[in-house]
Amino acid sequence: MTEYIHRNIDSELIAWKEDSMRKPLLLRGARQVGKSSAVKNFGKQFEYFAEVNFERNKAIKTFFQGDIDVRLIAKKISSYINVPIEAGKTLLFLDEIQECPEAIMALRFFKEDYPELHVIAAGSLLEFTLQELPTFGVGRIHSLFMYPMTFDEFLYANHEEGLILLRNEAYGNQSLDQAFHDKLVEYFRTYLLVGGMPESVLAWTKTHDFNRCRNIQEDIILTYEDDFSKYKKRVNPDLLRTTMRGICHQAGEKLTYKQISADYQSSQIREALRLLTLAGIVTPVVATSGNGIPLDAEADEKSMKVLFLDPGLLLAVLQLEGDLSQQLIELILAGTPQELVNKGGVIEMVAGLEMMRYKPCIQRQKMFYWEQKGKSVAEIDYLEIHNMKITPIEIKSGTQGGMKSLWLFMREKKLTEAFRCSLENFGSFDYIDKQDDDAIRHVTILPLYALSLLRSR
């Protein structure tokens, strides 16, 4: 039996189980991020676990045809798989539900007609199917979004719970002991290559073989592209493949459609990007004015960067494209922390992924950055809402003199707090702005291995 690795979603599932007002749960996310494993592990909380996989159990699709009687459907499933389905004792798991649109439509009726039964559904490229449904139970279904493993989950997989606890006690000017800091930096470098796909992480913990992880990552990418062909009646699979791979060449950069492909129009690439976003494979980072909350009130979707699902998968795509340079690998493994942060677009991308995944998973999160165009472009890597205030976050190592965009933004928006994220140890400093009546700007230095602390500080 495959070893289960602790996931952040575990606590969300337990809370859902205990909620007397719970709705059927739809677990959403890209293929192979660990949805099925998380539900199967959660199923141990119940006396019975009734699993239906619509890719394997095609006959069960017929149970959902015609008039929907969910109690009768549950009885039929119970008889077919020979597992008791009893309210309060059984978890009913409908996996790969995108293969049975009728089952998606039926989820709402479990809330209306059989609310005491615990029901979870999961699927991949689910949003491609949902687009064709008139409704699938808005208000009667609870969604949770799942992603590849965060850096903290990666540490858990490597049995470094104690290291996490030590790290969590440091903040601001209370730095971490250098030995622990160095160890976390090395783990972070490893995470960039191994990524957060559970199969790759498990392979790393067993073998410490980067090549084995890369083979797994390449297989996952090819599986994604095979999935695209299932929807060729709705969208051109080659367009999705070209867009997905093209995005990876622009990690940490402002997205340019022409660099993705000269064979497709911008409108086609834009539609492919929308579908990849819905599928959880990419996340746009949209430019915003940063004038107030909410950040998307003045967002400009014509200017965006894109976060790819996982750093390991990103490098696998570059490998498949013949564009993964030895210099990049050497930079990740052996470059100085300052070089790695300031020269590697993948670092900026991973920082964005980390910040996004530590937010509530009940909705698809939006990410924002700021830019000011002129003779020279000023840019802030990320804008976040922290303690109900707009907070600029720079992914950068170096001196105060290299942070002109940050001082410009804080001066313009009258802000006093910011974060600088790098592979430096914890720390903070004050900057006296001579161009703004000696206003004091306070900058907290937060290591990239500690971005989960943004939730609680």
Model region roles, listed by residue range:
Residues 131-249:
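Interdomain motor-coupling "hinge/lid" segment immediately C-terminal to the ATP-binding subdomain
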Residues 426-457:
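Domain-level recognition of nuclease-like catalytic cores that cleave nucleotide substrates
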Residues 38, 42:
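Hydrophobic positions on the alpha1 helix immediately C-terminal to the Walker A/P-loop
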Residues 351, 355, 380-399, 418:
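Conserved catalytic cores of phosphodiester-cleaving nucleases, focusing on short active-site segments
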Residues 56-88:
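Short glycine-rich substrate-engagement loop in P-loop NTPases that contacts/grips substrate
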